[in-house]
Amino acid sequence: MKEKKMKYQRYKRGQIVLIDFSPSMGSELRGKHFAIVITKKDSPNNGVLTVIPLSSKEKPYYLDIGNFVSKQVYPQLLNITRELYTALANLDSSDENEYNVEDVQKVINNVNEFKKVANIYINKNKKSFALVQNITTVSKIRIKKPVNHYDPIKNLIADSLILDLVDNKIKELFINDK
Protein backbone atom coordinates (compact mmCIF):
# COMPACT_ATOMS: atom_id res chain seq x y z
CA MET A 1 0.00 0.00 0.00
CA LYS A 2 1.27 3.46 -0.94
CA GLU A 3 1.98 5.88 1.91
CA LYS A 4 0.47 9.35 1.68
CA LYS A 5 3.14 12.00 1.21
CA MET A 6 3.05 14.90 3.60
CA LYS A 7 2.04 18.23 2.05
CA TYR A 8 3.89 21.37 3.11
CA GLN A 9 3.19 25.05 2.76
CA ARG A 10 4.52 26.58 -0.45
CA TYR A 11 6.86 29.55 -0.01
CA LYS A 12 7.82 32.26 -2.49
CA ARG A 13 11.32 33.49 -3.22
CA GLY A 14 11.92 36.57 -1.08
CA GLN A 15 9.35 35.63 1.55
CA ILE A 16 10.47 36.19 5.14
CA VAL A 17 10.07 33.27 7.53
CA LEU A 18 10.96 32.72 11.18
CA ILE A 19 13.13 29.64 11.65
CA ASP A 20 14.29 27.86 14.77
CA PHE A 21 17.88 26.88 13.93
CA SER A 22 18.32 25.00 17.22
CA PRO A 23 19.65 22.47 17.88
CA SER A 24 22.86 23.31 16.09
CA MET A 25 26.36 21.89 15.99
CA GLY A 26 29.61 23.74 16.63
CA SER A 27 29.56 27.25 15.18
CA GLU A 28 26.29 26.85 13.29
CA LEU A 29 23.64 29.49 13.77
CA ARG A 30 21.31 28.75 16.66
CA GLY A 31 18.05 30.09 17.99
CA LYS A 32 15.15 31.77 16.20
CA HIS A 33 16.03 34.03 13.28
CA PHE A 34 14.15 35.60 10.44
CA ALA A 35 15.36 34.33 7.07
CA ILE A 36 14.86 35.16 3.40
CA VAL A 37 13.62 32.30 1.24
CA ILE A 38 15.85 31.96 -1.82
CA THR A 39 14.38 28.76 -3.23
CA LYS A 40 13.20 29.67 -6.73
CA LYS A 41 10.37 27.20 -7.20
CA ASP A 42 8.90 25.65 -4.10
CA SER A 43 6.36 22.87 -4.02
CA PRO A 44 3.98 21.46 -1.40
CA ASN A 45 5.76 18.13 -1.92
CA ASN A 46 9.15 19.63 -1.04
CA GLY A 47 9.95 19.30 2.67
CA VAL A 48 12.99 21.61 2.61
CA LEU A 49 13.70 25.25 1.83
CA THR A 50 16.93 27.13 1.08
CA VAL A 51 17.20 30.32 3.11
CA ILE A 52 19.57 33.08 4.15
CA PRO A 53 19.31 33.89 7.86
CA LEU A 54 18.98 37.50 9.04
CA SER A 55 20.45 39.19 12.08
CA SER A 56 20.26 42.62 13.69
CA LYS A 57 23.93 42.41 14.64
CA GLU A 58 26.41 44.20 12.40
CA LYS A 59 29.56 42.33 11.46
CA PRO A 60 32.01 43.06 8.63
CA TYR A 61 31.02 39.96 6.65
CA TYR A 62 27.22 40.47 6.99
CA LEU A 63 25.30 42.13 4.15
CA ASP A 64 23.47 45.30 5.21
CA ILE A 65 19.93 45.17 3.82
CA GLY A 66 18.49 48.11 5.78
CA ASN A 67 15.53 48.06 8.12
CA PHE A 68 13.02 46.65 5.64
CA VAL A 69 11.46 44.36 8.27
CA SER A 70 10.33 47.26 10.45
CA LYS A 71 9.31 49.29 7.38
CA GLN A 72 6.86 46.52 6.51
CA VAL A 73 5.83 45.44 10.02
CA TYR A 74 5.20 48.76 11.76
CA PRO A 75 2.53 50.08 9.35
CA GLN A 76 0.68 46.76 9.68
CA LEU A 77 0.87 46.90 13.48
CA LEU A 78 -0.30 50.52 13.43
CA ASN A 79 -3.35 49.60 11.32
CA ILE A 80 -4.25 46.79 13.72
CA THR A 81 -3.87 49.19 16.67
CA ARG A 82 -6.28 51.62 14.97
CA GLU A 83 -8.78 48.81 14.38
CA LEU A 84 -8.62 47.78 18.03
CA TYR A 85 -9.07 51.38 19.24
CA THR A 86 -12.06 51.73 16.91
CA ALA A 87 -13.53 48.50 18.30
CA LEU A 88 -13.09 49.85 21.83
CA ALA A 89 -14.68 53.16 20.91
CA ASN A 90 -17.61 51.42 19.25
CA LEU A 91 -18.56 49.29 22.24
CA ASP A 92 -22.26 49.99 22.48
CA SER A 93 -23.99 50.76 25.73
CA SER A 94 -27.61 51.63 26.22
CA ASP A 95 -26.74 52.75 29.73
CA GLU A 96 -23.51 54.52 30.75
CA ASN A 97 -22.63 51.72 33.17
CA GLU A 98 -23.79 48.77 31.10
CA TYR A 99 -21.87 47.14 28.26
CA ASN A 100 -22.45 43.90 26.43
CA VAL A 101 -20.10 41.56 28.32
CA GLU A 102 -19.49 39.38 25.25
CA ASP A 103 -18.45 42.37 23.14
CA VAL A 104 -16.12 43.64 25.85
CA GLN A 105 -14.58 40.18 26.30
CA LYS A 106 -14.06 39.85 22.54
CA VAL A 107 -12.21 43.19 22.37
CA ILE A 108 -10.10 42.25 25.41
CA ASN A 109 -9.20 38.90 23.80
CA ASN A 110 -8.24 40.66 20.56
CA VAL A 111 -6.07 43.15 22.45
CA ASN A 112 -4.32 40.28 24.28
CA GLU A 113 -3.72 38.41 21.00
CA PHE A 114 -2.31 41.57 19.45
CA LYS A 115 0.00 42.14 22.45
CA LYS A 116 1.60 38.72 21.83
CA VAL A 117 2.51 39.80 18.30
CA ALA A 118 3.53 43.35 19.23
CA ASN A 119 5.95 42.05 21.89
CA ILE A 120 7.75 39.99 19.24
CA TYR A 121 8.22 42.87 16.80
CA ILE A 122 8.63 45.81 19.20
CA ASN A 123 12.45 45.80 19.07
CA LYS A 124 12.72 44.92 15.39
CA ASN A 125 13.16 48.59 14.46
CA LYS A 126 16.78 47.93 13.61
CA LYS A 127 18.80 47.34 10.51
CA SER A 128 18.81 43.82 9.18
CA PHE A 129 21.87 41.99 7.95
CA ALA A 130 21.83 38.97 5.67
CA LEU A 131 24.18 36.19 6.74
CA VAL A 132 24.82 35.13 3.15
CA GLN A 133 27.79 32.97 4.15
CA ASN A 134 25.30 30.96 6.27
CA ILE A 135 23.08 30.04 3.32
CA THR A 136 21.43 26.79 4.31
CA THR A 137 18.71 24.33 3.48
CA VAL A 138 16.32 23.61 6.33
CA SER A 139 13.37 21.34 6.91
CA LYS A 140 10.08 23.19 6.64
CA ILE A 141 9.30 21.72 10.05
CA ARG A 142 11.78 24.27 11.50
CA ILE A 143 9.68 27.17 10.21
CA LYS A 144 7.64 28.73 12.99
CA LYS A 145 3.96 29.30 12.32
CA PRO A 146 2.53 32.82 12.72
CA VAL A 147 1.69 33.51 16.38
CA ASN A 148 -1.92 34.29 15.47
CA HIS A 149 -3.96 36.06 12.80
CA TYR A 150 -2.40 39.43 13.73
CA ASP A 151 1.16 38.25 12.97
CA PRO A 152 2.47 40.22 9.96
CA ILE A 153 5.12 37.61 9.07
CA LYS A 154 2.81 36.04 6.51
CA ASN A 155 2.96 39.32 4.53
CA LEU A 156 6.69 40.04 4.75
CA ILE A 157 8.65 39.84 1.53
CA ALA A 158 12.05 41.17 0.49
CA ASP A 159 11.83 43.39 -2.57
CA SER A 160 13.80 42.86 -5.79
CA LEU A 161 16.55 45.30 -4.73
CA ILE A 162 17.31 43.25 -1.62
CA LEU A 163 17.15 39.99 -3.57
CA ASP A 164 19.60 41.46 -6.13
CA LEU A 165 22.00 42.42 -3.32
CA VAL A 166 21.74 38.90 -1.89
CA ASP A 167 22.22 37.27 -5.32
CA ASN A 168 25.33 39.37 -5.98
CA LYS A 169 26.77 38.49 -2.57
CA ILE A 170 26.12 34.78 -3.23
CA LYS A 171 28.02 35.09 -6.52
CA GLU A 172 30.86 36.93 -4.78
CA LEU A 173 31.16 34.34 -2.01
CA PHE A 174 30.46 31.08 -3.82
CA ILE A 175 30.95 31.43 -7.59
CA ASN A 176 34.46 31.27 -9.00
CA ASP A 177 34.68 33.89 -11.77
CA LYS A 178 37.98 33.21 -13.49
Task: Name what the model sees in each region.
Residues 1, 9, 62-178:
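C-terminal terminal-subdomain/extension
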Residues 4, 21-23, 37-38:
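Eukaryotic intrinsically disordered and solvent-exposed regulatory patches
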Residues 13-16:
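Loop/turn positions that initiate beta-strands
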Residues 22-28, 42:
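Short, charged beta-turn/beta-strand-edge "cap" motif at the junction between a beta-strand
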Residues 27-30, 60-61:
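Active-site-adjacent loop/helix micro-motif of nuclease/hydrolase catalytic cores
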Residues 30-41:
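Short beta-strand-centered aromatic/proline hotspots
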Residues 34-36, 50, 131:
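Residues located in well-ordered beta-strands
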Residues 39-59:
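Basic/aromatic-rich interaction segments and small domains that mediate binding to polyanionic partners
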